[in-house]
């Protein structure tokens, strides 16, 4: 059906039907647009107001008609309006000019900071890198955050799922990662806000400015580009904004040859938007009402996130699990692509342990001796088994008290509490709230520190000296300070 109709840039069609965000457009014979081409519709509505929108071709229906999904509201659109085939997919601006700016799905700035200072654009649809271009040797991506680097290390060019409810520190963790990749790896970040609250998008922008991740005085010194398609926008925008953000990240990786962090909040909303569009396009729904192309849609996005020989995109994706059902097709399909999971725990946050990353629930495919080495692996497993034993003993402690435990168990509890405290650390981006300077801890320092706790070398130091510090030398210095103050 499609082969007989070659694309013609600039060909004009007529809107024949509008059903919500889906439009049917009729073109002259032989001048049908290609699938995924952008159509531009401009005109005046019945009230005489100018309207303009972009739609993406999704289906060729026959009878010289195509079906397209609108990227903005279709209010005021009427049959008979003219639609122009742009001849290419949606393209967004890329490069340094995007840093510190907020874009919508079409790459238009929405932050009232004027036009973007670049003519370089890139289409949002492209193939994933070929296998010959990929860096296949697994490499750990050092974040400088102890609990992540030791217990659930990130893979360079991998995908990480970030799980956590409201108010447990997701945003602060994201900001710290953006800060650390800029300082330690010379890399940049792209944040894709997919179908989340507009208020959260604004809060994040303000927090980025406050913490210095976005430099409001000199945008060129900013470390992140933002691309938003919030939950009040049509499903077409929410379905494609993840690809817009990914395209910006790919330019930094492929052209600038940088290491890039891509944040997607929330990957579930991407699937949800695809499900809405699928139903509107008349496709038969599959399990739980999701689109029949669920695996293809998620795979097309995830496979473009990769580490090449030139640079890498490491993606951290917030995953909403509907009704906490991990077997739901949307999170289940996403899990198949993840290399690591970072689970934030409210109980840890309430204890004041920040980052509140759960050391027992967070996992990584990188935590194996062949990748991280024997010493790292043994240390991580010993830390986890000590914390697990402490967790098992907590009921006994709550009922009978510490005194009823055996000598060995008391020692385990003592070390586990020190480990738990040592897993916390002050963040650079939180300096303005805490008054504590942030710490970036090298992986070897992290391993060495935990080994000393496990070996009992630091049993004599007070528990409080392990709280919110960087490496083990700072623990010793803090212990001396506490001892001096208590005299």
UniProtKB/Swiss-Prot annotation:
Lineage: superkingdom: Bacteria
Membrane topology value: Peripheral membrane protein
Compartments where found: Cellular thylakoid membrane
The protein, known as: ATP synthase subunit beta
Subunit: F-type ATPases have 2 components, CF(1) - the catalytic core - and CF(0) - the membrane proton channel. CF(1) has five subunits: alpha(3), beta(3), gamma(1), delta(1), epsilon(1). CF(0) has four main subunits: a(1), b(1), b'(1) and c(9-12).
Keyword hit for Cell membrane: no
Binding site for ATP: 164-171
Organism: Synechococcus sp. (strain CC9311)
Molecular-function GO term, any one: proton-transporting ATP synthase activity, rotational mechanism
């Amino acid at each position: 059906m499609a082969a007989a109709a070659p694309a013609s840039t600039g060909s004009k069609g007529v809107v024949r039907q509008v059903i919500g965000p889906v439009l049917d457009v009729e073109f002259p014979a032989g001048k049908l647009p290609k699938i995924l081409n952008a159509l531009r519709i401009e005109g005046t509505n019945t009230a005489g107001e100018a309207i303009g929108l972009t739609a993406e071709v999704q289906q060729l229906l026959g009878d010289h008609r195509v079906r397209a999904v609108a990227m903005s509201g279709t209010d005021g659109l009427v049959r008979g309006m003219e639609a122009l085939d742009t001849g290419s997919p949606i393209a967004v601006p890329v490069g340094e000019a995007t840093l510190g700016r907020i874009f919508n799905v079409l790459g238009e700035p929405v932050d009232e900071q004027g036009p973007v200072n670049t003519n370089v654009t890139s289409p949002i649809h492209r193939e994933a890198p070929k296998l010959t271009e990929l860096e296949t040797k697994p490499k750990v991506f050092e974040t400088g955050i102890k609990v992540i680097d030791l217990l659930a290390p990130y893979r360079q060019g991998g995908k990480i799922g970030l799980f956590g409810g409201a108010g447990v520190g997701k945003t602060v963790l994201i900001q710290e990662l953006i800060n650390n990749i800029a300082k330690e790896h010379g890399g940049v970040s792209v944040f894709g806000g997919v179908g989340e609250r507009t208020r959260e998008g604004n809060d994040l922008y303000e927090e980025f400015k406050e913490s210095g991740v976005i430099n409001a005085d000199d945008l060129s010194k900013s470390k992140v580009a933002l691309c938003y398609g919030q939950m009040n926008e049509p499903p077409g925008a929410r379905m494609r904004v993840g690809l817009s953000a990914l395209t910006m990240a790919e330019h930094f990786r492929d052209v600038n040859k940088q290491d890039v962090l891509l944040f997607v909040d929330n990957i579930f909303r991407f699937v949800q938007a695809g499900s809405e569009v699928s139903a509107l396009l008349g496709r038969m729904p599959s399990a739980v009402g999701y689109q029949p192309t669920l695996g293809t849609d998620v795979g097309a996005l995830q496979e473009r996130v990769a580490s090449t020989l030139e640079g890498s995109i490491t993606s951290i994706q917030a995953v909403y699990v509907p009704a906490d059902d991990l077997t739901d097709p949307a999170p289940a399909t996403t899990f198949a692509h993840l290399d690591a999971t970072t689970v934030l725990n409210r109980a840890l946050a309430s204890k004041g342990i920040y980052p509140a990353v759960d050391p027992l629930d967070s996992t990584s495919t990188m935590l194996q001796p062949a990748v991280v080495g024997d010493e790292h692996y043994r240390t991580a497993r010993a830390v986890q088994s000590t914390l697990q034993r402490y967790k098992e003993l907590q009921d006994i402690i709550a009922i009978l008290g510490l005194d009823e435990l055996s000598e060995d168990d008391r020692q385990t509890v003592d070390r586990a509490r020190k480990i738990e405290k040592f897993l916390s650390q002050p963040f650079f981006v939180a300096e303005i709230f805490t008054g504590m300077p942030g710490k970036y801890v090298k992986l070897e320092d992290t391993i060495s520190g935990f080994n000393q706790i496990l070996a009992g070398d630091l049993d004599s130091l007070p528990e409080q000296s392990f709280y919110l510090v960087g490496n083990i030398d700072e623990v010793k210095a803090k212990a001396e300070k506490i001892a001096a103050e208590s005299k």
